[in-house]
């Protein structure tokens, strides 16, 4: 579902803390995160350089750990930045390389939809969360849309995009074998809150490249 093209879906409420707590009570689940995403983001600039086609994520404080990210340089977001709607950003290495020489990212100001965001950190997926690529087909499966990722706090997301956008969820499970069962349980929890039962929009568990490392995308 592409919000930027189709608008906000009807009857899909914003996910809340109680739902995350319910998800964390699933025996197979280790951690969980709710986030928002623009799958194809334009309007991202540093001076005269632009990044088109990358992703922008509005993340909660659990996202980096749940998805296996580690800091390369700088720091992650702190609670004051979430609470005070600070315009700060994290870049993955691909996005960082689009704008800066290595090591020159921190403290620089990029623009997202005309709003200034200060880069506070550069992140990458931990090696244990990266897939082993054995063929060109697998490469395109995992990396064909890897044009860079910019992360901002979920609290400041409406400054750039829209209020009350539906979130996505990701969980980490104890073992890869737990993914299917846990994913279905999370899917049920999230869909219980959808008010418009006739809508074509619902949450559905989806296997992504992290499935080999105990992650499940919702």
Name each region found by the language model.
Residues 33, 109-111, 170:
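Residues embedded in well-ordered beta-strands within globular domains across many folds
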């Amino acid at each position: 579902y592409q919000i930027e093209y189709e608008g906000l879906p009807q009857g899909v409420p914003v996910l809340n803390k109680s739902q995350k707590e319910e998800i964390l009570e699933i025996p197979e689940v280790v951690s969980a995160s709710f986030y928002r995403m623009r799958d194809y983001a334009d309007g991202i600039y540093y001076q005269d350089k632009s990044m088109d086609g990358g992703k922008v994520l509005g993340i909660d404080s659990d996202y980096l750990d749940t998805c296996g990210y580690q800091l390369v340089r700088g720091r992650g977001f702190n609670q004051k930045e979430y609470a005070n709607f600070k315009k700060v950003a994290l870049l993955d290495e691909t996005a960082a390389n689009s704008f800066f020489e290595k090591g020159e990212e921190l403290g620089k100001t990029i623009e997202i939809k005309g709003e200034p965001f200060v880069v506070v950190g550069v992140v990458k997926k931990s090696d244990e969360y990266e897939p082993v690529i054995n063929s060109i087909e697998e490469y395109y499966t995992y990396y064909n849309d890897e044009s860079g990722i910019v992360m901002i706090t979920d609290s400041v997301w409406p400054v750039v995009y829209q209020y009350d956008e539906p979130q996505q969820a990701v969980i980490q499970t104890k073992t890869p074998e737990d993914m299917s069962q846990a994913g279905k349980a999370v899917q049920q929890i999230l869909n219980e809150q959808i008010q418009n039962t006739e809508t074509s929009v619902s949450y559905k568990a989806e296997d992504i490249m992290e499935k080999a490392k105990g992650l499940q995308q919702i």
